[in-house]
C-alpha cells in the first residue's frame, strides 16, 4: 500500500503571509519527501488553503511521475479533504482552479483521500515549516515543487 501525506501553512498571517507546503510518500521501503512555495509571499492569494491544495497537487503530480496508482492520501485539512471527496462545495475563487487540477489528478491516480488529525501528519507539517524558513531566509524564491529524495 502506498500512502502520501500533505500539509500547508501560511505564516505569519493568513491570508497575506508566506504560503508553503510539504509532502511525503511512503513507497515500499522508501520515503520520498518534497516541499515548495505555493504563492508569491505576502500576496492576497497567499493563504493556508492555497498552500494545502498546492501541497496536494505537488504530491499527486509526483505520484503520477513515479507511476503510482490507487494511493491513499492523507491530510489534516478538513476543508480540502471534504471538498475533494464532494462533501463541501468550493466557493473561494482563488481555490477553484487548484481544486479542478487536484480532482483531475485524483481521478488519474484513482486516489483515496482521508482526513487525519494533525498529530498523524507531522512529517508533512515539518517539511512545510522547512520550506517556510527557506523562504524567510531568501533561499527559496520560486513558486513550485521541490523533490528532496
UniProtKB/Swiss-Prot annotation:
One of its GO terms (molecular function) is RNA binding. Its cofactor is Mn(2+); Mg(2+); Co(2+); Ni(2+). Monomer. Its EC number is 3.1.26.4. NCBIfam families: RNAseHI_Thmprot (NF041175). It is found in: Cytoplasm. Mg(2+) 2 binds at residues 7, 125. The keyword Lipid metabolism does not apply. It catalyses: Endonucleolytic cleavage to 5'-phosphomonoester. InterPro entries: RNase_HI-like (IPR053576), RNaseH-like_sf (IPR012337), RNaseH_domain (IPR002156), RNaseH_sf (IPR036397). Disulfide bonds join 58-145. It comes from Sulfurisphaera tokodaii (strain DSM 16993 / JCM 10545 / NBRC 100140 / 7). Mg(2+) 1 binds at residues 7, 52, 76. This is Ribonuclease HI. Pfam families: RVT_3 (PF13456). The protein is hyperthermostable, melting temperature (TM) for wild-type is 102 degrees Celsius, for the double Cys mutant is 93 degrees Celsius and for a C-terminal deletion of 6 residues is 77 degrees Celsius. The gene is rnhA. Nuclease that specifically degrades the RNA of RNA-DNA hybrids. Endonucleolytically removes RNA primers from the Okazaki fragments of lagging strand synthesis on its own. In the presence of Mn(2+) or Co(2+) can also cleave an RNA-RNA hybrid; the dsRNase activity is 10- 100-fold lower than RNase H activity. Complements the temperature-sensitive phenotype of an E.coli double rnhA/rnhB (RNase H) disruption mutant. CDD domains: RNase_HI_like. GO terms for cellular component: cytoplasm. Keywords: Cytoplasm, Disulfide bond, DNA-binding, Endonuclease, Hydrolase, Magnesium, Manganese, Metal-binding, Nuclease, RNA-binding. Mn(2+) 1 binds at residues 7, 52, 76. Mn(2+) 2 binds at residues 7, 125. Divalent metal cations; Mn(2+) and Mg(2+) are preferred over Co(2+) or Ni(2+). Changing residue 52 to Q: Loss of RNase H activity, loss of dsRNase activity. Does not complement E.coli double deletion mutant. Changing residue 118 to A: 10-fold reduction in both RNase H and dsRNase activity.
Amino acid at each position: 500500500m502506498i500512502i502520501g501525506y500533505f500539509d500547508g501553512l501560511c505564516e505569519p498571517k493568513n491570508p497575506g503571509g508566506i504560503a508553503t507546503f510539504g509532502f511525503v510518500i511512503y513507497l515500499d521501503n522508501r520515503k520520498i519527501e518534497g516541499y515548495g512555495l505555493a504563492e508569491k509571499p505576502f500576496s492576497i492569494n497567499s493563504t493556508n488553503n492555497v498552500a494545502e491544495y498546492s501541497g496536494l497537487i505537488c504530491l499527486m503530480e509526483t505520484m503520477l511521475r513515479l507511476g503510482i496508482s490507487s494511493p491513499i492520501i492523507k491530510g489534516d485539512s478538513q476543508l480540502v479533504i471534504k471538498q475533494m471527496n464532494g462533501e463541501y462545495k468550493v466557493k473561494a475563487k482563488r481555490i477553484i482552479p487548484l481544486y479542478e487540477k487536484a480532482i483531475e489528478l485524483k481521478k488519474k491516480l484513482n486516489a483515496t483521500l482521508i482526513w487525519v488529525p494533525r498529530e498523524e501528519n507531522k512529517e508533512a507539517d515539518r517539511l512545510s515549516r522547512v520550506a517556510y524558513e527557506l523562504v524567510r531566509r531568501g533561499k527559496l524564491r520560486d513558486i513550485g515543487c521541490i523533490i528532496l529524495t
